[in-house]
Amino acid sequence: MKNKIKIRLKSFDHRSLDQATKEIVSAVKRTFATINGPIPLPRKIERFTVNRSPHVHKKSREQFEIRKHKRLLVIDDPNPAVVDALSKVDLAAGVDVVIELESGE
């Protein structure tokens, strides 16, 4: 039976995301566990187009975009020290973390 921990990180700022992945990877490597990643997932770009003027000048528009960056980390055969190290990692405020535990049979 092989267990895995999948950690998905999401952020609007790629610099804070890369810093968070470095902190997680170094914390896991201190426990001598095997880690795969960081695997960069496709970024999602949402674009919004709005009129500059509320009344006339339909051709005058402004465009905005939001870029969502994502990374994936996979830890193979985690031990209790890995879970303890992950709970003590302090990450930046703009990084969203989703942790999944996968048990293989």
Swiss-Prot record:
Instruction: Write out the GO biological process terms.
Output: translation
GO cellular component terms, alphabetically, are:
ribonucleoprotein complex; ribosome
Descriptive protein name = Small ribosomal subunit protein uS10
**Its quaternary structure?**
Part of the 30S ribosomal subunit.
Give UniProt keywords alphabetically: Ribonucleoprotein, Ribosomal protein
SMART domains named among the record's database cross-references:
Ribosomal_S10 (SM01403)
Q: Which family does it belong to?
A: Belongs to the universal ribosomal protein uS10 family.
Q: Could you tell me one molecular function GO term of this UniProt entry?
A: tRNA binding
Q: Where is the signal peptide?
A: none
InterPro entries, from UniProt?
Ribosomal_uS10 (IPR001848), Ribosomal_uS10_dom (IPR027486), Ribosomal_uS10_dom_sf (IPR036838)
- Physiological role: Involved in the binding of tRNA to the ribosomes.
Pfam families reported in the protein's UniProt record:
Ribosomal_S10
Name the source's superkingdom.
Bacteria
* Organism the protein comes from: Rickettsia prowazekii (strain Madrid E)
